[in-house]
Amino acid sequence: MADPVIPVVLFAYARPAHLARALACLRENGVPLIYAFADGAKGAADAVAVAETRALLRAVDWCEVRLTERTENWGLGKNVLAGVTAVAAEHEAFVVWEDDLIAVPGTYAWVGAALRHYAADERVMSVSAWTHPRVT
């Protein structure tokens, strides 16, 4: 894999509290580049939360952020497809991250190492992670 930087492709919508936790996690993991796709509000009721979400993305000062702010609500499926397609045109590998995802320190490094390790293996199309839901 020739691409030394593996960006995170982050999808966000009107959930600023979720996004704040996700961004803290990405910061702790040392992510160098984020492509953020912020969907537009579904209606007036979501406009404030969408604005707060976008403000959090604009305030990131610890890595490069390439922010796309949708003027209309595209919906999750269309927004993800368009975002992944755009980033795939520029990078061989990337990590998809939603605004409600948090992970332990080292997750980004582990995923990056796995992507680099399997880059030439035609049997491997993607790397993913999952954990059993914690019940408290």
Question: What is each stretch, according to the model?
Answer:
Residues 1-28:
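N-proximal low-complexity "stem/linker" segments adjacent to membrane-targeting elements
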Residues 106-136:
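Conserved donor NDP-sugar-binding/catalytic core segment of glycosyltransferases
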Residues 32, 92, 125:
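Short acidic/polar active-site loop segments enriched in Thr and Asp
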Residues 8-10, 36, 96, 126:
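Structural beta-sheet core signal
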Residues 71-79:
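A short, glycine-/small-residue-rich helix N-cap motif at loop->alpha-helix starts
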Residues 25-68:
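Acidic donor-binding segment of Leloir-type glycosyltransferases
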Residues 91-102:
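Short beta-strand-to-loop acidic/aromatic patch adjacent to the donor-nucleotide binding site
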Residues 81-93:
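Active-site nucleotide-sugar/metal-binding loop of Leloir-type enzymes
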